[in-house]
């Protein structure tokens, strides 16, 4: 009689453990996947506006942004120029001001927005009205 009563108790314990494990897996996946569903990165692209003008040195750009408190994720070269990915999108305006002040005339700085989701990645320049011509303002 004791064996008959202990079997249902063991089965209930097994189901509770399986249910607990499933809930843990769902919670862990939610924590990992949820931030990836709608991530937006703000980048700036520096391009030469004149033929023969070289792309600015990435280390120089990094140094100037860092000196002014702008945190960046990466600086990479692409076929059109230099792409600077900002660590904090709210620092975009400060980064633009620093680059406009530090770069010599002949460079264009444009916003580039990267939308990432779990299933889709889109990289496109922002509206043309957000393009700036760098150089010292006197």
UniProtKB/Swiss-Prot annotation:
Topology within the bilayer: Single-pass membrane protein
Coiled-coil portions: none
Keyword Transmembrane helix applies: yes
TM ranges: 18-38
Protein's UniProt keywords contain Calcium: no
Cytoplasmic side: 1-17
Pfam families, alphabetized: SecD-TM1
Domain of life assignment: Bacteria
Molecular function as annotated in GO: protein kinase binding
Location of this chain's protein in the cell: Cell inner membrane
Periplasmic side: 39-138
Gene Ontology cellular-component annotations: plasma membrane
Keyword tags: Cell inner membrane, Cell membrane, Membrane, Transmembrane, Transmembrane helix
Main location: membrane
Family named by the database record: Belongs to the MzrA family.
Family matches, as NCBIfam families: PRK10629.1 (NF007915)
Function: Modulates the activity of the EnvZ/OmpR two-component regulatory system, probably by directly modulating EnvZ enzymatic activity and increasing stability of phosphorylated OmpR.
Protein name: Modulator protein MzrA
Species, as recorded: Edwardsiella ictaluri (strain 93-146)
Gene: mzrA
């Amino acid at each position: 009689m004791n064996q008959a009563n202990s079997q249902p108790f063991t089965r209930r314990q097994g189901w509770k453990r399986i249910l607990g494990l499933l809930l843990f897996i769902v919670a862990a996946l939610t924590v990992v996947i949820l931030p990836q569903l709608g991530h937006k990165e703000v980048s700036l692209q520096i391009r030469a506006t004149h033929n023969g003008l070289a792309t600015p040195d990435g280390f120089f750009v990094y140094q100037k942004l860092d000196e002014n408190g702008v945190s960046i994720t990466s600086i990479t070269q692409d076929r059109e120029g230099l792409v600077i990915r900002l660590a904090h999108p709210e620092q975009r305006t400060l980064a633009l001001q620093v680059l406009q002040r530090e770069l010599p005339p002949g460079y264009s700085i444009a916003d580039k927005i990267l939308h990432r989701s779990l299933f889709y990645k889109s990289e496109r320049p922002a509206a043309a009205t957000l393009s700036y011509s760098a150089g010292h303002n006197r």
